[in-house]
Every structure is written in structure tokens, then in C-alpha cells.
Regions:
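Short, well-ordered alpha-helix to beta-strand connector turns
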Residues: 46, 73, 141-143, 171-172, ...
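Short helix-loop-beta junction
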Residues: 107-119
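Class I SAM-dependent methyltransferase SAM-binding "motif I" and its flanking Rossmann-like core
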Residues: 147-148, 154-158, 164-220
Length: 276
């Protein structure tokens, strides 16, 4: 079903659209738009959640949407727990995340400079080096928590292992997650089959957000569309397919920017009759 956008950037279905509205599929704009038909997330415990595919929040299309949430006074904590099992010790960890040598260091650290945040305001949680108390203090003393991309199931496993789930779920600052870091913010998420995960699966997340699911790195592939339909049918929730240049902001309601596909779950007539 095609979606249409009115002058206030509200998205409606083709049945509700007027002649002067633009079709969502033809609408090339990075301005935020909202889904009026999506109910507010129940049990929202955190002020703001940001769901992305990339850490590059200094790119113009992301910056223009996040700049009102991030200020130069903020303190950032980066939680890189999403590495795969081939990272076995601190030496391996340093090759990915340490200053001066980590391949993912600058793409998580330097991106905050555009918002006026300097290096002294950014800390990293080191899975292999920090004690649990040190990890908790770094998280609690921050106003922005960055959850990195990679393996969502392994990230949740490590969060539980280090007894961090409760303080992350109840985090009162801005939570930014990309790819795996976006997925685990949900109470329940799915993993579509790909080169890293051969089988479809449901996984439990942090439980910060509920009432919907996401398909990150969305390309509208056959496998992704099959996964989306499976989730809609089995879980009875709507799914957002987030293209590489798309993102979501959950701040009391759901606001989307860039390119997404909204797959709404609709109760079938048969099911509705059964309920009645």
C-alpha cells in the first residue's frame, strides 16, 4: 500500500490521501515526518531513543534531525559490546575500538565533534578491562549512550553478563543505537537471515521500547520482506524497514526521517470476527 504525505509531513494511507498530497515513495526529503496512525509506545521509560543504521551522526541528513537533542554540554558513553566472537581479548578489542588503532574508533568518537562535544566528554566501556562498577559509573555519568552495531544477540548476552541491563533499560538520557544497537532497544526483535545469521530468529532485547519492530539495513529484499510478513503474522505488530539513509526518533511518539518503509499490521476480517 502506498503512503502519502501532507503539508505538515504527516503520513496517511492511500485511502485517506487527498489529491494535493505527494506519494511517500516519490517524496525525496530528509525532513522528519510522523505516523499519526501509530500508537505511542507503551512503557516508555527513556526520554529519547534514536534508531539508525550508521554511527555517522555528523552527516548532514542525520545532523539536521538530531541537533535539537544533542548539545555541547552532553557527556557521551559508548558501549561497544556488539563485537563478534572472533574478538577474544583486550588486544583484539583494541584493534577495533582503541584510540589511534581501532578501526571503529573515529566513526564512533569523532562524529560527536560536530555537535560541539570534545574528546574529554566521551568515555568508552571496555568489556575486557573495566570492572562492572566502572562500567555502571560510566553509563550513569553520561547524558548520551551510544549502542554500537554488530551482533545484537551477543551484545545482549554481554550486557546481561555484566549486570547492566537494568541501568540501561532505565537510562534517563538520550540512547542512540545503530544496527544491532537499535534492535536491542526493543522488548522483542527479530534477526533476518544473512551472511552472519543463517536462520530467522526472535530475540529478547532491553525492553525500552515496545509495540513495533524494525528491519535495519532495509533493501526490500525477498528475505527481508518474508521476515517482515512473518513478524506481522506471528506477533501482530507493525514493522519499520529502515533503509541505509533512514532513521527513527522515539520521543513520546514516533518520528521518522530519511527513507523508511512502514509495514502496518492490520487485523484480518476473520480474526476480527473471531474476537467479536
Amino acid at each position: 500500500m502506498k503512503l502519502y504525505i501532507d503539508q505538515k509531513n504527516n503520513v496517511v494511507t492511500m485511502h485517506e490521501a487527498s489529491e494535493d498530497m505527494k506519494c511517500f515513495e516519490e517524496f525525496e526529503n530528509s525532513k522528519p515526518y510522523t505516523f499519526d496512525t501509530v500508537k505511542e509506545v507503551k512503557g516508555l521509560e527513556n526520554p529519547v531513543h534514536i534508531l539508525l543504521n550508521t554511527s555517522m551522526i555528523d552527516e548532514k541528513w542525520i545532523y539536521m534531525n538530531l541537533k535539537k537533542y544533542i548539545s555541547k554540554q552532553d557527556r557521551v558513553c559508548i558501549l561497544p559490546f556488539s563485537f563478534f566472537d572472533d574478538t577474544k581479548n583486550e588486544v583484539d578489542w583494541n584493534k577495533q575500538y582503541a584510540p589511534g588503532q581501532g578501526i571503529w574508533y573515529r566513526s564512533n568518537q569523532d562524529v560527536f565533534h560536530k555537535y560541539g562535544i570534545c574528546d574529554e566528554q566521551i568515555v568508552w566501556v571496555n568489556y575486557f578491562k573495566d570492572t562492572i562498577d566502572e562500567m555502571k559509573m560510566k553509563i550513569l555519568n553520561s547524558s548520551i549512550l551510544m549502542l554500537t552495531g554488530g551482533a545484537p544477540d551477543l551484545m545482549m548476552k554481554r550486557i546481561k553478563e555484566k549486570k547492566l541491563k537494568k541501568i540501561i533499560k532505565n537510562y534517563k538520557g538520550i540512547m542512540i543505537g545503530y544496527s544491532a544497537g537499535a534492535m536491542i532497544q526493543l522488548d522483542l526483535y527479530h534477526i533476518s537471515p544473512d551472511e552472519d545469521y543463517p536462520k530467522f530468529s526472535y530475540q529478547n532485547g532491553l525492553g525500552c521500547l515496545s509495540g513495533f519492530d524494525i528491519e535495519p539495513h532495509f533493501r526490500k529484499s525477498k528475505i527481508q520482506m518474508e521476515s517482515i510478513e512473518k513478524v506481522k503474522e506471528e506477533k501482530g505488530i507493525s514493522i519499520y524497514g529502515i533503509y541505509e539513509d533512514g532513521g527513527m526518533i522515539i520521543d513520546k511518539g514516533i518520528t521518522c526521517f530519511g527513507k523508511l518503509l512502514f509495514c502496518k499490521w492490520v487485523v484480518s476480517d476473520k480474526l476480527l470476527q473471531a474476537v467479536l
